[in-house]
Swiss-Prot record:
Source species of the chain: Ectopseudomonas mendocina (strain ymp) (Pseudomonas mendocina)
SUPFAM superfamilies assigned: Nucleotidylyl transferase, Ribokinase-like
GO molecular function annotation: ATP binding; heptose 7-phosphate kinase activity; heptose-1-phosphate adenylyltransferase activity; phosphotransferase activity, alcohol group as acceptor
Gene Ontology, cellular component aspect: cytosol
Annotated ATP binding sites: 194-197
The name this protein goes by in its record: Bifunctional protein HldE
Alphabetized HAMAP family for the sequence: HldE
Matches recorded under InterPro entries: Bifunc_HldE, Carboh/pur_kinase_PfkB_CS, Cyt_trans-like, PfkB_dom, RfaE_dom_I, RfaE_dom_II, Ribokinase-like, Rossmann-like_a/b/a_fold
Enzyme Commission number: 2.7.1.167, 2.7.7.70
Length: 473
């Protein structure tokens, strides 16, 4: 399947479930307490992040989709912090605020990016289930997907009322389940247990065949539209009636913290389905999103640009021939990793040894090399009738195959000035024996603080000379 990122801005999603505040105390540790054999943490920073169902809504909003949230909090400072954080992120929150009961807070003590301790502050909520159902039913009219984010904390009292209300309106219901009784999710469009949660219900699975068999049985018993089992480092398995199982390998480049990964999966699924994606594509996007979020510390959201870059990597556009839009995203990703962007341009009609040497020298000026080449019409204008010898797609393919070249892009004008204004490379490189002031686009690059460098050409290497030699034979 070919992955693309859908338009999330017209894909409203309603999340209902257990909201909580993830609080982090960050500090340094340099000694052991004289009172007990425990480290002493000197707290230097306190950070609050939305957690649980609130993190699901936050992830949906971070992708650019309208996010609505229904949940239960106390009447306290933690609820105020949650409300403020969600409002700042564009989440429309509808909370039942209950006096004399605390908002759920999970406090983590961190030192040097390591979690030393977690403390949970929570009590069972006396939720007004009827009032919540009325609130949800009223909000369903303006959304395309309903998410039940269930942490078993008491916000969700009557799952079936909510599922049936959504089904009557033709709205898909996605549930992130919890507990030992999955029958409460009967009739959901999709549930997303992790492997441990799944095996708690169906028993241990010795291999994938047993997982598929038990999953199919569970779907039949609960009348589910689909089942997605998240399996950590083994990826995900999507099961659907009348379809072959879809196994997706894990995509994490580096696992730093799995906190909130399940929230990221269901939020990306929900936003993608709301945006019109077919389920296999939505699952593939969720798999990529999970691979990104486990590389972050703590409860975290991913943005649409981050997911778009992951899609590009998946589709092989991290290197090679790119469109301008793809190139700009790739550059953004490279700069986020502190890489220096080098730019050169030319016709590159017949690639020869001089070109290869020059491009290797250009690549050495930074971390990433962009080669911009004139399209066929502009080469003809510059070089005259009979040129180019090779069409632009062939010239680009040859350049993309060189180890020194990261990205190849074409332009239609006679000069790359428009492209330079959009790309804004750190270094503009040209080959020749002329001064910097004669380099086309030098003024553009220097105006924003970039560098311009002129590299010497390899002697006795000329495309024009090669063409003339061939024609004279």
């Amino acid at each position: 399947m070919k992955l693309t990122l859908p338009r999330y801005d017209q894909a409203p999603v309603l999340v209902v479930g257990d909201v909580m505040l993830d609080r982090y105390w960050h500090g340094g540790t340099s000694r052991i307490s004289p009172e007990a054999p425990v480290p002493v943490v000197r707290v230097e920073q306190i950070e609050d992040r939305p957690g649980g169902a609130a993190n699901v809504a936050l992830n949906i909003a971070a992708l650019g989709a309208p996010a609505l949230l229904v949940g239960v909090t106390g009447e306290d400072e933690a609820a105020d912090s949650l409300t403020d954080s969600l409002a700042a992120a564009g989440v429309e929150a509808h909370f039942q605020r209950i006096e004399d009961q605390p908002t759920i807070v999970k406090l983590r003590v961190m030192s040097r990016h390591q979690q030393l301790l977690r403390m949970d502050f929570e009590e069972p909520f006396n939720t007004d289930a009827a009032a919540m159902a009325r609130e949800v039913e009223a909000l369903l009219a303006g959304v395309k997907v309903l998410v039940l984010s269930d942490y078993g904390k008491g916000a969700l009292q009557n799952h079936q009322v909510l599922i049936q209300a959504a089904r009557k309106k033709g709205i898909p219901v996605l549930a992130d389940p919890k507990g030992k009784d999955f029958s409460i999710y009967r009739g959901a469009s999709l549930i997303t247990p992790n492997l441990h949660e799944f095996e708690t219900i169906v028993g241990g699975c010795a291999d994938e065949a047993e997982l598929v068999s038990k999953g199919a049985k569970l779907m039949r018993e609960l009348e589910l539209g689909a089942l997605l089992v998240t399996r950590g480092e083994h990826g995900m398995t999507l099961l659907r009636p009348e379809h072959a199982p879809l196994h997706l390998p894990a995509r994490a480049r580096e696992v730093f913290d799995v906190t909130g990964a399940g929230d990221t999966v269901i939020s990306t699924l929900a936003a993608s389905i709301a945006a019109g994606e077919e389920l296999p594509n939505a699952v593939a996007l969720a798999n990529l999103a999970a691979g990104i979020v486990v590389g972050k510390l703590g409860t975290a959201a991913i943005s649409a640009p981050e997911l778009r870059r992951a899609v590009q990597r998946e589709e092989g556009s991290e290197r090679g021939v790119l469109s301008l839009d793809q190139l700009l995203i790739a550059i953004e990703d490279a700069r986020a990793h502190g890489e220096k962007i080098v730019f050169t341009n030319g016709c590159f009609d017949i690639l020869h040894a001089g070109h290869v040497t020059y491009l290797e020298q250009a690549r050495a000026q930074g971390d990433r090399l962009i080669v911009a080449i004139n399209d066929d019409a502009s080469v003809s204008r510059l070089k005259g009738p009979g040129r180019p010898i090779n069409a632009v797609d062939r010239r680009m393919a040859v350049l993309a195959g060189l180890g020194a070249v990261d990205w190849v892009v074409s332009f239609a004008e006679d000069t790359p000035e428009r492209l330079l204004k959009q790309v804004q490379p750190d270094v503009l490189v040209k080959g020749g024996d002329y001064g910097i002031d004669q380099v086309v686009g030098a003024d553009i690059v220097q105006a924003y603080g970039g560098e311009v460098r002129v590299l010497g050409l390899v002697e006795n290497s000329s495309t024009t000379a090669i063409v003339e030699k061939i024609r004279n034979k």
